[in-house]
Structures are given as C-alpha cells and as structure tokens.
C-alpha cells in the first residue's frame, strides 16, 4: 500500500489505515538500523532538506540520519546562518530550496500552521517536524510505535499524558493518533497549563496526578516548555515538581507494567526524577531509536514511490 498523500502535516486527518501503514513499515526499518551495515539504496537519487526555525537535537538529527540510511542526499539548512538572517521571506526561502531540486522538506517552525502554508506553496513534499503548539506528528508516531512494540497492541489502552498540555504539540498529536485505536486518554496538569475545551478532543482532564494515573498502561510525560510560557502559569518549578513529577514512588497507582515515555529533552527533577528516567521502566532512549525507524518509514513511503519492499 502507498501512503497516498503529498504531505504529512499532522495526525488529525490521518486515517487509521494510514497510521498502521506507517507503524508497520517502521518494523523492517528498525531491523536495518539495528544491524552492522545500516545503509540501503532505496532512496538513491532522491534529495531531502531539513529546515528548522527552532532548535532540535532528536528530530532534526534523526531525519538526517534516516535519509542517509536510505541513501537519499540529505542537507540540513542552518537557518541561523542562512539568508533568513538577511531578511529573506519564508516564501522566497522555500522557492529557492525548491528550484534546487529537493524532493522533500522537513520543516519545524515556531508559528502554528507554517508547514501547511509551505505545503500549499511548493511542489516539494513536506513533513511537519513541529509547528508551534499545534502538532508534532512524527513524535506521536514514534511514541505509538514504542507502545505497540512493548504492549503488542494499541487497542483500548489507558494512557495518561502529564504536564504542560497547553503548549504541547506532542500532546495534541498523541491524542489524535491514539484516539484512532480507542484508547482511554487522560490529560493531567495544573489548571493554568490545561487548554480550555480539551475535553472536546475526547479526553478526560485531571488536576490530580494520583487520580489520572490510576490503572493506566502508559504514562507520557511532557517537558515544561519554559520558552513558550509567560510568567505566572505556576508558582515555581519546585511546586510543580511536588505535584506532578513522576518518580518510582508516584507510579504505585499505575499498573505494574506501566510504560513511561518522554519526548525529550527531559528536565530532571522537574517532570521526572533521575531515578525513574534512568530505570528500565522509562523508554526514553528506545523512543529515540524508534524515531529513526519511524522517520525512515515516512521517507520511504513518501519518496520511495510506494514500492512494496525495501531494497536491501
């Protein structure tokens, strides 16, 4: 089956079948990255560019690595040293990149909806690598892949998303993705970090961590996004940690085999204790590995012409 769409801008409009296709395609991709020789010629002759207007370690690097593992020519545009700093408009930047012959652009931008604007104004395929507080589809896909790999299914799981829901594109994409599989999704955090009307997305909202994680299969911890916040949303990081930090002790109300996820980077001692972050229950490093596999799957499906098999 081919991923029959030009762009991947979010999970909200992605069907369950398309989601399953991406997750299933990531399985052989992970086999590739776990072997000694990781290079396959599948996308030889294709060209990929990453354009990040916000800082990134995991997403940008994993997309670059995914492209190289698939033999695509992969270029990272450094916005801080580009003509953007000379006042070049977004539209002109995108057109300049397009006429160089790139097939696909991976874009991150601080303003919600920017990748959608770009997709409407270029022939290149576009993958949204995070747009403001809107969506981060590939993060949610790698989270879902990690959960399915460990649990064997995504069907009807109980999932708690903890922390800064208001500013989190990761939370929104996870809600859109997991809801396709009938998951019981709970969001928990301070009232000032809970977006109004979040229940309209089919989730239950909580302000008590103990209540929210009672009997859950998965806990996805969100980073406190200090760079997006105005002052006064909560009294202090210390008070936030007292109420919402996950530690081995706070997991007592969850299931014994609960999975603990975090998109990174983590703020140790704020959202998650170092003891829990470094424990076997926390899948933070596995998420990073799976992120490469998911992004390889997307590049293959979007640039590989829909071939049924990977070329080894």
UniProtKB/Swiss-Prot annotation:
The record lists L-aspartate as bound by: 86, 169, 223
Listed Pfam families: OTCace, OTCace_N
GO MF terms, alphabetically ordered: amino acid binding; aspartate carbamoyltransferase activity
Q: Which pathway does the protein contribute to?
A: Pyrimidine metabolism; UMP biosynthesis via de novo pathway; (S)-dihydroorotate from bicarbonate: step 2/3
EC number in record? 2.1.3.2
Record's PROSITE patterns?
A: CARBAMOYLTRANSFERASE
Please write the reaction equations for the catalytic activity of this protein. carbamoyl phosphate + L-aspartate = N-carbamoyl-L-aspartate + phosphate + H(+)
Q: Which UniProt keywords apply?
A: Pyrimidine biosynthesis, Transferase
**Positions annotated to bind carbamoyl phosphate:** 58-59, 108, 136, 139, 264-265
Under InterPro entries, the record lists: Asp/Orn_carbamoyltranf_P-bd (IPR006132), Asp/Orn_carbamoylTrfase (IPR006130), Asp/Orn_carbamoylTrfase_sf (IPR036901), Asp_carbamoyltransf (IPR002082), Asp_carbamoyltransf_Asp/Orn-bd (IPR006131)
GO CC annotation: cytosol
Q: How does it assemble?
A: Heterododecamer (2C3:3R2) of six catalytic PyrB chains organized as two trimers (C3), and six regulatory PyrI chains organized as three dimers (R2).
Q: Which family does it belong to?
A: Belongs to the aspartate/ornithine carbamoyltransferase superfamily. ATCase family.
Q: What does this protein do?
A: Catalyzes the condensation of carbamoyl phosphate and aspartate to form carbamoyl aspartate and inorganic phosphate, the committed step in the de novo pyrimidine nucleotide biosynthesis pathway.
Q: What is the name of the protein in this document? A: Aspartate carbamoyltransferase catalytic subunit
Tell me which species this is from. Syntrophomonas wolfei subsp. wolfei (strain DSM 2245B / Goettingen)
Q: What is the lineage of its organism?
A: Bacteria, Bacillati, Bacillota, Clostridia, Eubacteriales
């Amino acid at each position: 089956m081919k991923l029959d769409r030009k762009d991947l801008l979010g999970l909200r409009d992605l069907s369950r079948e398309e989601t399953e296709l991406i997750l299933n395609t990531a399985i052989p991709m992970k086999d590739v990255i776990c072997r000694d020789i990781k290079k396959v010629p599948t996308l030889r002759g294709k060209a990929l560019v990453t354009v990040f207007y916000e800082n990134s370690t995991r997403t940008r690097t994993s997309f670059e690595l995914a492209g190289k593992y698939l033999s695509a020519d992969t270029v990272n545009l450094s916005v801080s040293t580009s003509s953007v700093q000379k006042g070049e408009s977004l539209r002109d930047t995108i057109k300049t990149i397009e006429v160089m012959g790139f097939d696909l652009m991976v874009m991150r931008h601080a303003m919600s909806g920017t990748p959608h604007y770009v997709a409407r104004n270029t022939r290149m395929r576009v993958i949204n690598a995070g747009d403001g507080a809107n969506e981060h589809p590939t993060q949610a896909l790698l989270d879902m892949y990690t959960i399915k790999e460990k649990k064997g299914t995504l069907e009807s799981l109980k999932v708690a998303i903890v922390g800064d829901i208001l500013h989190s594109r990761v939370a929104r994409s996870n809600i859109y993705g997991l809801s396709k599989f009938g998951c019981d999704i709970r969001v928990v955090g301070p009232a000032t970090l809970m977006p109004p009307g979040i229940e309209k997305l089919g989730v239950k909202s909580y302000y008590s961590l103990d209540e929210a994680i009672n009997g859950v299969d998965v806990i996805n911890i969100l980073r406190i996004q200090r760079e997006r916040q105005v002052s006064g949303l909560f009294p202090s990081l210390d008070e936030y940690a007292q109420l919402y930090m996950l530690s081995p002790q706070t997991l007592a109300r969850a299931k014994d085999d609960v999975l603990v996820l975090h998109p990174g980077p983590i703020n140790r001692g704020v959202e998650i204790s170092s003891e829990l972050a470094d424990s076997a229950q926390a899948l933070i490093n596995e998420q990073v590995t799976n992120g490469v596999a998911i992004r390889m799957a997307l590049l293959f499906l979007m640039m590989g012409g829909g071939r049924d098999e990977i070329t080894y």
